[in-house]
Amino acid sequence: MKSLCLLAIVAVVSAEVYFKEEFNDASWEKRWVQSKHKDDFGAFKLSAGKFFDVESRDQGIQTSQDAKFYSRAAKFDKEFSNKGKTLVIQYTVKHEQGIDCGGGYVKVMRGDADLADFHGETPYNVMFGPDICGPTRRVHVILNYKGENKLIKKEITCKSDELTHLYTLILNADNTYEVKIDGESAQTGSLEEDWDLLPAKKIKDPDAKKPEDWDEREYIDDAEDVKPEDWEKPEHIPDPDAKKPEDWDDEMDGEWEPPMIDNPEYKGEWKPKQIKNPAYKGKWIHPEIENPEYTPDDELYLYENWGAIGFDLWQVKSGTIFDNVLITDSVEEAEAHAAETFDKLKTVEKEKKEKADEEARKVEEEARKKAEEEKEAKKDDDEEEEKEEEEGHDEL
C-alpha cells in the first residue's frame, strides 16, 4: 500500500500542468481575451451561482445575457506538443439556469491562434464538452485531423440538471481515449475506430459481382398449391335485409339500389402457401479487399502545438458557470485537482439546492392552499349573498 501511495505522489509531482484557471478573483479578465470579431458578443461575469460551499473557490465565469454568442479565450504560459504523452482536458460546467438550448464546451487550439479574432471558424485541435438543445443532450468530442473536424461516432449523453458537473477528456499516446463525467467513465475506445479519421481498412471488391444464379429467397410459392374453386367472393355485397323505402320514387329518385355491406364470405386475395426454397443460398455478402487508400497512423492522438483554450458558444438562456479549467499530461493530477475543487463543492451544492427546492415547494403548496381557501370562501360568500337576495325577494 505504501509503495502505491509513493507511486501516486511521484506521478503527481512529475506531472506537468500546461494551463489552470480557477477564476478565484477579478484578474481572470486580464488572462482571458474578449474577441473583437463582432461587437455584440455576450458578457461573462464572475459568479459562484446560487448554491456553493466557499464562494472564492467555487466561483467561475457565468454567461449573463440571453440569446447571445460568447467568445473569450486564454493563452497557455507556453506552447507544447503531446507527443508520447497523455493529454487531459478537464473543467466544470453548471447550467444553473435550467438550459434549454446552448453550448457548454471548450475549444483547445494552437498557440498561434488570434484570440482577439476568436470565432466559430477559428481552427482548433479539440472541441470537448456538453451541448444541449431541446431533446438533444450530447457531449461533443471533435478532433481536427488534417484540417478537418471529425465528430465522435458514439453517443455520449451529458448532464442536463442545474448542478455542477466535471467533464474530463483523456487522449492517450496509444491512440485510445476516455471521457469521464463527474469522475466516472462515460466512454472509452480507440481513436481510429470511434472517429472517421482514416479511410476504411477494407473496402468492397469492385470486381466482385453476385452470381446470376445466386438465389436469396429463403421461401418461395408452393407450385402445387391451387386456389380453391370457391375462393373468389366479392368484398362487398348488397344488404339482403335492406328494403326500398315506401316513399321512393324511381322516376324522381332513380332506380333504387340496396346499400352495400361487407361480405362475410370474402377471403381476400389468394396467395399460394410458402415453402422452403431448395435453391436458397443465403444473403450474398460482397467480398472485401484491403483498401489501397488506407495507411495506418500511430499518432492520431498527436498535436504538435497546443497553446490556447476558449469558449465559443451560443446560448438562448444564459446562466451557465464554467470553472476549474485544467490542461495537464497527468490523469492523477487531474483527479487531485478535482478532489480539491469539484469534490468539495458537489455534496454541499446538492444539499443546499435540495433544501431550497423543498422550501420553494412548500411556499408553492401554501400559496396553492391559500388560493383554494380564498376561492372556497368567495364561493360561500356568493352563495350567502344569493340566499339573502332570494329571501328579500320572497318577503316582497
Swiss-Prot record:
Residues 1-15 form the signal peptide. InterPro entries: Calret/calnex, Calret/calnex_CS, Calreticulin, Calreticulin/calnexin_P_dom_sf, ConA-like_dom_sf. Residues 202-250, 342-396 are annotated as: Disordered. GO terms for biological process: defecation; determination of adult lifespan; endoplasmic reticulum calcium ion homeostasis; ERAD pathway; hemidesmosome assembly; IRE1-mediated unfolded protein response; programmed cell death; protein folding. Sequence repeats lie at residues 186-197, 205-216, 222-233, 239-250, 254-264, 268-278, 282-292. It is found in: Endoplasmic reticulum lumen. Residues 213-224, 381-396 have a biased composition (Acidic residues). A motif (Prevents secretion from ER) lies at residues 393-396. SUPFAM superfamilies: Concanavalin A-like lectins/glucanases (SSF49899), P-domain of calnexin/calreticulin (SSF63887). Residues 202-212, 225-246, 342-380 have a biased composition (Basic and acidic residues). Residues 254-292 are annotated as: 3 X approximate repeats. Keywords: Calcium, Chaperone, Disulfide bond, Endoplasmic reticulum, Lectin, Metal-binding, Repeat, Signal, Zinc. Residues 193-301 are annotated as: P-domain. Residues 302-396 are annotated as: C-domain. Residues 186-250 are annotated as: 4 X approximate repeats. Disulfide bonds join C101-C133. Its main location: endoplasmic reticulum. Coiled coil: none annotated. GO terms for cellular component: endoplasmic reticulum lumen; endoplasmic reticulum membrane. GO terms for molecular function: calcium ion binding; carbohydrate binding; unfolded protein binding. An alpha-D-glucoside binds at Y105, K107, Y124, D131, D312. Molecular calcium-binding chaperone promoting folding, oligomeric assembly and quality control in the ER via the calreticulin/calnexin cycle. This lectin may interact transiently with almost all of the monoglucosylated glycoproteins that are synthesized in the ER. Probably by controlling the folding of extracellular matrix protein unc-52/Perlecan, may play a role in the formation of fibrous organelles, a hemidesmosome-like structure attaching muscles to the epidermis. Protects dopaminergic neurons against oxidative stress-induced neurodegeneration. Belongs to the calreticulin family. Can be divided into a N-terminal globular domain, a proline-rich P-domain forming an elongated arm-like structure and a C-terminal acidic domain. The P-domain binds one molecule of calcium with high affinity, whereas the acidic C-domain binds multiple calcium ions with low affinity. The interaction with glycans occurs through a binding site in the globular lectin domain. This is Calreticulin. It comes from Caenorhabditis briggsae.
